[in-house]
Amino acid sequence: MLEISKDELMNESSQFIENVFTLEPWNSVSKECTSILIYPKTQESYPFEIWIIFSNASLMSFKNFPLRDSILEYGNLISDKSSSSFKINIFSYERLKGFLQNSNSASMELNWSIRNSISLIDNHNRHFELVEESKRINLKNHENLIRNYFLSVNSIVYSINNNNKCNDLMYNELILIFMRIGNLLEKDCFPPVAVLENEFRSLEIGKKYLANLNYIKDKIYSGQELTPDSKDIINRFMSDISKLVIAKFGNTKKWMNDPNSLNYILPNFK
């Protein structure tokens, strides 16, 4: 795919959505919508996504809009006006706002998408409201997610340190979780997999370890066994992650003081 600048993408997406709103039945509902571009952090995010958002009250007033009932029932759908360059997702504003308040991974990816979106049409200030909503963090849910990732990666590292025959899937899962937990700890965000490595690269811990993690990935893909220096990289990364966790939550959490926690697994942690 050809490289495209942010300005070019905004111009093309604005032109595309304007053309859509000249068509029946879209021309009758355009004044009630918010339209946003989900700006990609990587050129691999293709086709680009445009979200069209209506309030439930507006949808109820669209007596002749054929998609009305489906949007009200399911909360969102993909429009048949999508093209090879742009995919249109249509949302109920109320349902979308509700999705942002959930704590599962899909909702947290949605939060990331909203935070990184660009307003194309915003007749009712809904884009601003959604961005503000996406920044609100349920601290308990956030801690639970970090705890679950922390304990999962802790278990994998323990297996690696005690078993030279861990499979490739385990190492790949480890690197994915490293990137996930790094973003959660430094930026309180949960990027989609397509942009996860790119986002991890911008973190302080990412700048320190990304090249090393890619080195480990290359060894895995080439079928080589991990050497002691590779395991040392993993343990040093986990030590730094543990320090970030303690800096964020303190060392009073039960899951940080469990007998199987890193305080006990890594001999040089303290």
In which residue ranges do the predicted regions lie?
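Intrinsically disordered, low-complexity acidic/polar segments
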Residues: 59-61, 97, 188
